[in-house]
Amino acid sequence: KKFINYFSRNNYVKVLSPSSKNIDKKESKLSYQGFKSSNFLQKIIYILISLFKWKPMQLGYFYSPKIKKYVLNNLDSYDLVFLQSLRVAQYLPENINKKTILDMGDITSKNYYQTSKRLFFLNPLKIIYLLEGFLVEKYENFCFMNFSKILLFSKKEIDSIKSNFKK
């Protein structure tokens, strides 16, 4: 929220997010549009589609065709695109010619690998966490290569990423 308030001081800012219902409101230079989230069955289908495409399950869980359509139809209206998590990076088309910033927070794949290591080897969740860790790491690398800037919280994590990703 701090980034949004900072950006909206001198720029027009449009915030898109999943919501319990469709919402559209505006306050001076800041406007908000909420898109109703997919239902449970749709989420399961989107998760399976993500797995079929070798992308993280969480991308499928949080996928919204309405947000995707809005972004594709309105992208040319903005000078800068700021995305606040790995999960929403999926809405940005590849090879975009705009300044893009992704606030990842932390390197999520490491969390999945750590959780997988702590689970008993016969626990089926171990395989799910390991698979999601691999898919998230692959997607993180894609984001590092395709975004103008990536924001991370921890200096330790910044230092741990490959030098060819540092911008």
Task: Identify the role of each PLM range.
Residues 13-15, 100, 150:
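Hydrophobic/aromatic residues located in beta-strands of well-ordered beta-sheets
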Residues 71-89, 98-101:
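Short N-terminal targeting/anchoring amphipathic segment
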Residues 21, 87-88, 156-158:
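Alpha-helix capping/helix-boundary segments
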Residues 1-33, 76:
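N-terminal subdomain of nucleotide-sugar transferases
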Residues 3, 65-72, 108, 125-150:
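Membrane-proximal helix-turn-helix segments that form the acceptor-binding/catalytic region
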Residues 93-98, 142-153, 158-167:
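Helix-loop-beta element that forms the nucleotide-linked donor phosphate-binding surface
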Residues 40-60, 100-138:
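Acceptor-binding helix/loop patch of EC 2.4 sugar-transfer enzymes
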